[in-house]
Amino acid sequence: MSKNRSSLQSGPLNSELLEEQKQEIYEAFSLFDMNNDGFLDYHELKVAMKALGFELPKREILDLIDEYDSEGRHLMKYDDFYIVMGEKILKRDPLDEIKRAFQLFDDDHTGKISIKNLRRVAKELGETLTDEELRAMIEEFDLDGDGEINENEFIAICTDS
Protein backbone atom coordinates (compact mmCIF):
# COMPACT_ATOMS: atom_id res chain seq x y z
CA MET A 1 0.00 0.00 0.00
CA SER A 2 1.32 3.47 -0.79
CA LYS A 3 0.31 5.02 2.53
CA ASN A 4 3.95 5.60 3.45
CA ARG A 5 3.84 8.71 5.58
CA SER A 6 7.61 8.91 5.90
CA SER A 7 7.99 9.74 2.21
CA LEU A 8 6.09 12.95 2.88
CA GLN A 9 8.06 14.03 5.94
CA SER A 10 10.11 16.56 4.02
CA GLY A 11 8.89 19.50 2.01
CA PRO A 12 7.17 22.78 2.80
CA LEU A 13 3.65 21.35 3.08
CA ASN A 14 4.73 18.94 5.79
CA SER A 15 6.35 21.65 7.90
CA GLU A 16 3.26 23.88 7.74
CA LEU A 17 0.70 21.24 8.75
CA LEU A 18 0.12 20.51 12.43
CA GLU A 19 0.66 16.91 13.54
CA GLU A 20 -3.08 16.69 14.25
CA GLN A 21 -3.86 17.76 10.67
CA LYS A 22 -1.43 15.20 9.23
CA GLN A 23 -3.05 12.51 11.35
CA GLU A 24 -6.55 13.56 10.21
CA ILE A 25 -5.49 13.29 6.57
CA TYR A 26 -3.99 9.85 7.16
CA GLU A 27 -7.03 8.62 9.09
CA ALA A 28 -9.48 9.89 6.47
CA PHE A 29 -7.57 8.10 3.73
CA SER A 30 -7.28 4.88 5.74
CA LEU A 31 -10.91 4.91 6.80
CA PHE A 32 -12.33 5.43 3.32
CA ASP A 33 -9.89 3.24 1.36
CA MET A 34 -12.62 0.62 1.57
CA ASN A 35 -10.81 -2.18 -0.23
CA ASN A 36 -7.42 -1.33 1.34
CA ASP A 37 -5.69 -1.10 -2.03
CA GLY A 38 -3.85 2.14 -1.22
CA PHE A 39 -6.01 4.17 -3.59
CA LEU A 40 -9.27 6.12 -3.41
CA ASP A 41 -11.78 5.97 -6.23
CA TYR A 42 -14.20 8.83 -6.89
CA HIS A 43 -16.73 7.79 -4.24
CA GLU A 44 -14.09 7.05 -1.59
CA LEU A 45 -12.37 10.37 -2.33
CA LYS A 46 -15.64 12.27 -2.09
CA VAL A 47 -16.47 10.93 1.38
CA ALA A 48 -12.87 11.25 2.63
CA MET A 49 -12.85 14.90 1.58
CA LYS A 50 -16.24 15.46 3.19
CA ALA A 51 -14.96 13.90 6.42
CA LEU A 52 -12.20 16.51 6.40
CA GLY A 53 -14.76 19.29 5.89
CA PHE A 54 -14.55 19.78 2.12
CA GLU A 55 -17.56 19.28 -0.13
CA LEU A 56 -16.55 19.72 -3.75
CA PRO A 57 -18.74 19.39 -6.82
CA LYS A 58 -18.41 16.11 -8.72
CA ARG A 59 -16.57 17.78 -11.61
CA GLU A 60 -13.88 19.22 -9.31
CA ILE A 61 -13.30 15.85 -7.66
CA LEU A 62 -13.01 14.15 -11.05
CA ASP A 63 -10.60 16.88 -12.20
CA LEU A 64 -8.45 16.32 -9.10
CA ILE A 65 -8.31 12.59 -9.80
CA ASP A 66 -7.36 13.23 -13.43
CA GLU A 67 -4.69 15.75 -12.41
CA TYR A 68 -2.92 13.30 -10.09
CA ASP A 69 -3.69 9.99 -11.82
CA SER A 70 -0.64 9.32 -14.00
CA GLU A 71 -1.73 5.75 -14.78
CA GLY A 72 -5.24 6.49 -16.05
CA ARG A 73 -6.89 4.28 -13.42
CA HIS A 74 -9.21 7.03 -12.08
CA LEU A 75 -7.73 6.58 -8.61
CA MET A 76 -5.81 8.76 -6.15
CA LYS A 77 -2.94 7.38 -4.07
CA TYR A 78 -2.19 8.47 -0.50
CA ASP A 79 0.77 10.75 -1.30
CA ASP A 80 -1.38 12.75 -3.72
CA PHE A 81 -4.32 12.82 -1.29
CA TYR A 82 -1.96 14.15 1.39
CA ILE A 83 -0.79 16.95 -0.92
CA VAL A 84 -4.29 17.89 -2.10
CA MET A 85 -5.85 17.84 1.37
CA GLY A 86 -2.85 19.47 3.03
CA GLU A 87 -3.04 22.39 0.62
CA LYS A 88 -6.81 22.70 1.12
CA ILE A 89 -6.44 22.62 4.91
CA LEU A 90 -3.76 25.32 4.84
CA LYS A 91 -5.99 27.55 2.68
CA ARG A 92 -8.93 27.31 5.09
CA ASP A 93 -10.15 30.56 6.57
CA PRO A 94 -10.28 30.05 10.35
CA LEU A 95 -13.31 32.34 10.63
CA ASP A 96 -15.19 30.23 8.06
CA GLU A 97 -14.33 27.12 10.08
CA ILE A 98 -15.70 28.70 13.25
CA LYS A 99 -18.90 29.73 11.45
CA ARG A 100 -19.28 26.20 10.08
CA ALA A 101 -18.87 24.81 13.61
CA PHE A 102 -21.54 27.25 14.84
CA GLN A 103 -23.95 25.82 12.26
CA LEU A 104 -23.39 22.33 13.69
CA PHE A 105 -24.65 23.57 17.05
CA ASP A 106 -27.44 25.72 15.58
CA ASP A 107 -29.31 22.84 13.93
CA ASP A 108 -32.66 24.62 14.24
CA HIS A 109 -31.26 27.64 12.35
CA THR A 110 -32.30 30.28 14.87
CA GLY A 111 -28.94 32.02 14.71
CA LYS A 112 -28.35 31.13 18.35
CA ILE A 113 -27.17 28.18 20.43
CA SER A 114 -29.77 27.35 23.07
CA ILE A 115 -29.64 24.93 25.98
CA LYS A 116 -31.57 22.52 23.75
CA ASN A 117 -28.84 22.75 21.06
CA LEU A 118 -26.10 22.30 23.64
CA ARG A 119 -27.90 19.31 25.20
CA ARG A 120 -28.14 17.64 21.78
CA VAL A 121 -24.43 18.16 21.03
CA ALA A 122 -23.44 16.89 24.49
CA LYS A 123 -25.59 13.79 23.96
CA GLU A 124 -24.06 13.19 20.50
CA LEU A 125 -20.61 13.38 22.10
CA GLY A 126 -21.64 10.94 24.83
CA GLU A 127 -21.49 13.59 27.56
CA THR A 128 -24.06 13.58 30.33
CA LEU A 129 -24.53 17.14 31.54
CA THR A 130 -27.32 18.52 33.69
CA ASP A 131 -29.39 21.48 32.55
CA GLU A 132 -27.72 23.45 35.32
CA GLU A 133 -24.27 22.68 33.85
CA LEU A 134 -25.46 23.55 30.34
CA ARG A 135 -27.00 26.81 31.60
CA ALA A 136 -23.72 27.68 33.34
CA MET A 137 -21.82 27.10 30.09
CA ILE A 138 -24.12 29.45 28.22
CA GLU A 139 -24.08 32.10 30.97
CA GLU A 140 -20.28 32.09 30.92
CA PHE A 141 -20.19 33.36 27.33
CA ASP A 142 -23.60 35.02 26.88
CA LEU A 143 -22.43 38.60 26.46
CA ASP A 144 -25.82 40.13 25.63
CA GLY A 145 -27.66 38.31 28.43
CA ASP A 146 -30.37 36.72 26.27
CA GLY A 147 -29.75 33.19 27.56
CA GLU A 148 -28.33 31.93 24.27
CA ILE A 149 -25.05 32.13 22.36
CA ASN A 150 -25.20 34.03 19.06
CA GLU A 151 -22.64 33.67 16.28
CA ASN A 152 -20.54 36.64 17.40
CA GLU A 153 -20.39 35.30 20.95
CA PHE A 154 -19.40 31.88 19.58
CA ILE A 155 -16.64 33.47 17.48
CA ALA A 156 -15.39 35.27 20.60
CA ILE A 157 -15.32 31.95 22.50
CA CYS A 158 -13.34 30.26 19.74
CA THR A 159 -10.88 33.09 19.23
CA ASP A 160 -10.41 34.07 22.89
CA SER A 161 -11.40 37.65 22.08
Curated annotation (Swiss-Prot):
InterPro entries: CALM/Myosin/TropC-like, EF-hand-dom_pair, EF_Hand_1_Ca_BS, EF_hand_dom. It is found in: Nucleus envelope; Cytoplasm, Cytoskeleton, Microtubule organizing center, Spindle pole body. Residues 20-55, 56-91, 93-128, 129-161 form the EF-hand domain. Ca(2+) 2 binds at D142, D144, D146, E148, E153. One of its GO terms (molecular function) is calcium ion binding. One of its GO terms (cellular component) is nuclear envelope. One of its GO terms (biological process) is spindle pole body duplication. The modification Phosphothreonine is found at T130. Keywords: Calcium, Cell cycle, Cell division, Cytoplasm, Cytoskeleton, Metal-binding, Mitosis, Nucleus, Phosphoprotein, Repeat. Ca(2+) 1 binds at D33, N35, D37, E44. It comes from the Eukaryota. Component of the spindle pole body (SPB), acting as the connector of microtubule arrays in the cytoplasm and the nucleoplasm, is involved in nuclear positioning before chromosome segregation, SPB separation, spindle formation, chromosome segregation, nuclear migration into the bud, nuclear reorientation after cytokinesis and nuclear fusion during conjugation. The SPB half-bridge, which is tightly associated with the cytoplasmic side of the nuclear envelope and the SPB, is playing a key role as the starting structure for and in the initiation of SPB duplication in G1. Functions as a component of the spindle pole body (SPB) half-bridge. At the SPB, it is recruited by KAR1 and MPS3 to the SPB half-bridge and involved in the initial steps of SPB duplication. Also involved in connection with the protein kinase KIC1 in the maintenance of cell morphology and integrity. May play a role in vesicle-mediated transport, in a VPS13-dependent manner. Belongs to the centrin family. This is Cell division control protein 31. It comes from Saccharomyces cerevisiae (strain ATCC 204508 / S288c) (Baker's yeast).
